[in-house]
Amino acid sequence: MYDKKLAAYAEKHCACVRQLDLCARYFCAGRINAEVNARLHKSILDGMSRAWKNAQAYARRHGISAEEMRSYQWH
């Protein structure tokens, strides 16, 4: 089953995961300080949470099962 809107939410979630990884790498490399890193992490985590909640709500409204949701590649 393929659903463009759900796929878009999944892509947003995955983009947030990639951004979070990039932030962690830059922080570990000493390129951004702890305060900036914390703000970026919070912003990205908020984005991930919104994308996931939107995807769940969309799936419920359109009768997409939990099994079908799990079949999407979220990470």
Which residue stretches match the model-derived regions?
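Short, charge/polar-rich alpha-helical segments
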Residues: 1-17
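Short, charge-rich amphipathic interface segments used for partner binding and complex assembly
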Residues: 26, 33-72
